[in-house]
């Protein structure tokens, strides 16, 4: 309802539920669903699309990270096989599919944290390639920001705790 009212009123700053201000949740999910409503019209399908795209982005990012981290001496078929298997397992896991089909902020939080941690992994393990390391740092910062916009400070706290625990 909040994204629909954002689209109808044109006010993308103040979330409203039945005409009343509604600041119970951060705005990222509202913005993504509202943008989808503007592009595809107001429908259940358009409401679910942003979460599905977020889930899909993590699957492809995991695939790409596994290819980037594969040893150079390993055969291409082994690299592709491992990356495909891991990304496929994530893509077909019931929890990932279930949250990816629903229009709730939990998938935006999970995707933001996952992409941030994948960015950290890229920056940490690819020190030999400066551009990949920089890309990892940018991804870490960008997707921590997305996670904060999706669910609040927990979007920064969880990746931070994981990284501190790892280091």
What is the role of each PLM region?
Residues 1-167:
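Membrane-integral, polyisoprenol-dependent glycosyltransferases
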């Amino acid at each position: 309802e909040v994204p629909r009212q954002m689209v109808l009123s044109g006010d993308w700053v103040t979330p409203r539920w039945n005409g009343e201000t509604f600041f119970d949740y951060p705005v990222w999910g509202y913005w993504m669903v509202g943008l989808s409503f503007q592009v595809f019209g107001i429908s259940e399908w358009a409401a679910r699309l942003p979460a599905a795209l977020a889930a899909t982005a993590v699957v492809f990012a995991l695939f790409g990270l596994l290819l980037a981290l594969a040893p150079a001496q390993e055969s291409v078929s082994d690299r592709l096989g491992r990356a495909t298997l891991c990304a496929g397992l994530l893509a077909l896991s019931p929890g990932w599919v279930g949250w990816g089909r629903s229009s709730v902020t939990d998938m935006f939080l999970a995707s933001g944290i996952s992409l941030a941690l994948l960015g950290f992994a890229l920056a940490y393990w690819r020190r030999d390639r400066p551009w990949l390391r920089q890309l990892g740092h940018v991804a870490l910062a960008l997707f921590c920001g997305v996670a904060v916009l999706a669910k609040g400070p927990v979007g920064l706290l969880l990746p931070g705790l994981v990284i501190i625990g790892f280091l």
